[in-house]
A protein has these predicted regions:
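Conserved, well-structured ligand/cofactor-binding cores
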Residues: 4-121
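Single conserved hydrophobic/aromatic residue that forms the stacking wall/gate
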Residues: 120-129
Length: 129
């Protein structure tokens, strides 16, 4: 799923894939293809999505993980990893991994996909899930 390559002499990237195809994403960033495309095609203005909104999404993801664990819909180790990742977002430790501008398509899909890709990419690498 992920291939790494060196671009130029400064940046290493990995290939991320989605329904549109593949795109290079910096290896040190916890976002996927959708976020990288949004950065490329919606580079409008200077204002980023506010941290308060990102933290709100993380609170919802954390609550969902707690409820799903309680209802035995996900394993405790997965729930614990989602909770840990969510807490890091809530505490602002990973703000640099949410690079999107406020000007998007109107539905907020890019911001939600950024949050989803963050969890997807950090769980196996940081939390050994």
């Amino acid at each position: 799923m992920t291939n790494f390559e060196k671009v130029g002499t400064f940046m290493k990237t990995r290939k991320e894939y989605d329904s549109i195809g593949k795109i290079n994403v910096p290896v040190d960033k916890y976002w996927g293809a959708s976020t990288q495309r949004s950065k490329k095609f919606f580079d409008i203005g200077e204002f980023l999505v506010r941290p308060r909104l990102i933290k709100s999404i993380a609170i919802i993801k954390k609550a969902a993980a707690i409820v799903h664990r309680k209802e035995k819909q996900i394993k405790p180790r997965i729930s614990n990893a989602i909770i840990k990742a969510s807490n890091e977002v809530i505490n602002g430790k990973l703000d640099d991994h949410f690079p999107l501008k406020v000007w998007q398509t109107g539905s907020g899909t890019q911001t939600n996909m950024n949050a989803v890709s963050y969890t997807h990419l950090t769980l196996p690498t940081i939390y050994s899930v």
